[in-house]
């Protein structure tokens, strides 16, 4: 496998794997971040970049170790890349860029806030996170890199914790409307409709 492709896969998985950790900084303390006079992103974004650097340092010793190298694994990987990109596109429908960027969670005065339960969100509550998972699985499957598989597992565990915290924060914000939505729509894996 070309070194450039291996390194792109590794860095992509490093960045994706830290997304749940980034949000774990936000959701338990959403009220704190909203109470700040200045944008909390001045603290949060450099902290997230520091997470990337730390994860690169931690995983660098084995970033070239592959479980396998098979060209055919790129066939399902391309399907996963496509699914991830489609989920990102569908996630934009009925959702503002501010919502996608998490501004209502951290900035005060981000009104009006409304719960979006249509489109792709009628099938899965967190389609962007599902898109991230598809992208990480695609890099892992296509490259066979141990580090990509490990980072995907790490993101899955931290993502599950983060989703629980985000659900609590959304329930606090939207109340019974969110409780009903959560009881009928799965978090990540959509129900298959036949």
Put a short name on every predicted segment.
Residues 118-133:
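Membrane-interface loop-to-helix entry segments
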């Amino acid at each position: 496998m070309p070194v450039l492709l291996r390194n792109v896969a590794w860095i992509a998985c490093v960045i994706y794997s830290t997304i749940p950790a980034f949000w774990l900084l936000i959701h338990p303390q959403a009220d704190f971040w909203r109470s700040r006079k200045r944008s909390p992103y001045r603290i949060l974004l450099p902290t997230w970049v520091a997470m990337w650097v730390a994860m690169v340092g931690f995983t660098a010793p084995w970033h070239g170790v592959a479980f396998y190298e098979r060209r055919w694994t790129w066939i399902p990987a391309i399907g996963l890349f496509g699914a991830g990109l489609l989920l990102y596109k569908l996630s934009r429908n009925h959702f503002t860029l501010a919502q996608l960027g998490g501004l209502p969670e951290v900035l005060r005065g981000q009104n009006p806030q409304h719960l979006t339960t249509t489109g792709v969100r009628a099938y899965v509550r967190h389609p962007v996170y599902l898109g991230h998972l598809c992208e990480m699985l695609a890099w892992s499957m296509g490259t066979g890199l141990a580090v990509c598989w490990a980072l995907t597992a790490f993101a899955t565990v931290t993502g599950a914790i983060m989703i629980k915290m985000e659900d609590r924060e959304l329930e606090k914000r939207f109340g019974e409307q969110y409780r009903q939505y959560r009881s009928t729509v799965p978090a990540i894996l959509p129900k298959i409709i036949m």
